[in-house]
A protein has these predicted regions:
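Active-site acidic/histidine clusters and adjacent loop/turn architecture
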Residues: 1-52
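Intrinsic-disorder/low-complexity peptide segments enriched for small residues
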Residues: 34, 38, 53-56, 124, ...
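Catalytic cores and adjacent binding grooves of peptidoglycan-active enzymes
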Residues: 5-7, 23, 46, 62, ...
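Cell-wall polysaccharide-cleaving catalytic domain and substrate-binding groove, primarily
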Residues: 54-73
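Active-site proximal helix-loop segment of RNase H-like, two-metal nucleases, encompassing DDE(D)
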Residues: 76
Length: 172
């Protein structure tokens, strides 16, 4: 029997989400594809999407490290908008929040952006619901533009943070 971990399969669309990128952009081990399917479906349903109105995800292939063996995936867009654009919207909302003097206004601003911003919501869903790799001596393999402020491993290098400013990376 072949090693199940060596078989690479595309990340499949779910009921409430669609993979909009070509299948070869996310050829992963079955374990990673299944974990992504579970988390993406839960994220999509919680964000209000369904079979009649699915959310889209766009993957791009990576070329180093875990990507070489299908153990890592990079998500570049959710809902047709790039992760970098979602991050820019998040930062703009927080800048507006810093100008708010009223604690109630603060809660409204952060709450509204947290509901609207699919990039941030996706990062938090991947963080909360996924089981990602953590090689000995290394951080949990979830990186993206929110890692320094929201991530499970906030003390990452500038180089690593900069490399993941426009996408979310997970590995299993």
């Amino acid at each position: 029997m072949a090693d199940e971990g060596a078989t690479r399969v595309p990340v499949a669309s779910g009921k409430a989400y669609r993979v909009a990128s070509p299948p070869e952009h996310a050829l992963e081990t079955r374990a990673l594809a299944n974990e992504l399917h579970k988390v993406l479906e839960r994220f999509a349903v919680e964000a209000g999407f369904n079979e009649r109105n699915p959310v889209s995800f766009f993957f791009k292939p990576g070329v180093v490290g875990h990507h070489k063996v299908g153990r890592a995936a990079d998500i570049y867009a959710v809902g047709g908008i790039g992760i970098d654009r979602w991050k820019k919207c998040w930062d703009q909302a927080l800048q507006q929040d810093h100008r708010a003097m009223d604690p109630q206004q603060h809660c409204r601003i952060v709450g509204a952006e947290g509901k609207r911003n699919l990039g941030w919501r996706l990062y938090k869903a991947l963080q909360g619901y996924g089981r990602w790799a953590q090689p000995y001596g290394y951080p949990i393999q979830l990186f993206g533009p929110w890692t320094r402020t929201e991530g499970p491993w906030q003390y990452i290098s500038d180089r690593l943070l900069n490399a993941h400013r426009d996408h979310i990376h997970v590995a299993k």
